[in-house]
A protein has these predicted regions:
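N-terminal pre-domains immediately preceding structured catalytic cores
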Residues: 2-12, 20-202, 206-278
Length: 278
């Protein structure tokens, strides 16, 4: 009797196992196939960081910022503000490579920046008296004198657009009614953000330059944080963030070829929309 029961149980198990095969097969067939990963400018779509994707800005389309340049603190963020400035002020920390747009609720929007050689000479307080969309660029007399081989080919200037070293936006800083020739601006050199560059003033990712530009009005105060304050507020590690980057040689033929192609598509541009206090 026990043998009969055991045999019957075995047959039942076998029968149930057979019945389960089509069900399992049907379940397996119902699993959707994954689509191939999509890429944007060589970046996997799934890795594009929110706020730094493709950005259509008027006639121009900005590429996404590669995620390797947005690691850790090197991206835009709303953070508690622990500095000493009042709401509505821009505070630049050239040591920790941050720019703060101070809010009224004890918070600030913190942007990562790069600080060029000219920017390292900034100190004290200035005021934004001019804002330009897609600004053109001309090297200063000091730049031409200091490194004629690099800047000489650009003495005639580069019109506003994707090829301009000032990027998508520029904020022009004045003191006592006079242009200081210091700028807060975008950049095409995304790898420089978070570091010290060989040239330029205060650089931002173009996405961040546009974001800041749209927030700050003309007349905004801009204050540069001292190294001592940077250490007190950020800590010694962040106050010494980044590395000194070597000079980057840019082929003028490539730049002006890009300008010619841009002019063929959009017409001859110099500066885009200009807002200024006169």
């Amino acid at each position: 009797m026990k043998n009969q029961i055991a045999a019957a149980t075995a047959r039942l198990r076998h029968f149930l196992a057979i019945l389960s095969l089509p069900v399992l097969g049907a379940c397996a067939a119902a699993v959707p196939q994954l689509e191939p990963e999509q890429f944007v400018n060589g970046i996997p779509f799934s890795q594009i960081v929110d706020g730094y994707g493709i950005l259509q800005d008027g006639e121009f389309s900005l590429p996404p910022v590669p995620p390797e340049y947005l690691q850790g603190v090197n991206r835009r963020a709303v953070v508690p503000y622990t500095g000493y400035q009042s709401a509505g002020t821009i505070e630049i920390d050239p040591h920790a490579k941050f720019l703060y747009w101070v809010q009224s609720d004890g918070m600030a929007i913190r942007y990562p920046i790069a600080v060029g050689r000219e920017g390292r000479g900034m100190s004290g307080e200035t005021v934004i008296r001019r804002k330009v969309e897609w600004p053109g660029w001309t090297p200063t007399a000091n730049m031409l004198r200091r490194e004629p081989a690099i800047y000489g080919p650009f003495a005639g200037g580069v019109p506003g657009g994707l090829a301009s070293p000032l990027g998508a936006r520029a904020l022009y800083l004045y003191r006592g009614g006079r242009d200081t020739y210091y700028r807060i601006h975008g950049t095409n050199d995304m790898s420089s953000i978070g570091n010290s560059g060989s040239a330029g003033c205060i650089r931002m990712f173009n996405h961040d330059a546009i974001d800041l530009f749209d927030r700050v009005p003309l007349g905004t105060r801009v204050v540069v944080r001292t190294y001592a304050d940077s250490v007190r507020i950020e800590g010694e590690a962040l106050a010494n963030r980044g590395v000194e980057l070597p000079p980057v040689y840019v082929d003028p033929q490539q730049v002006y070829a890009a300008v010619a192609a841009q002019n063929a598509r959009h017409g001859n541009l110099n500066d885009g929309v200009v807002n200024e206090v006169r």
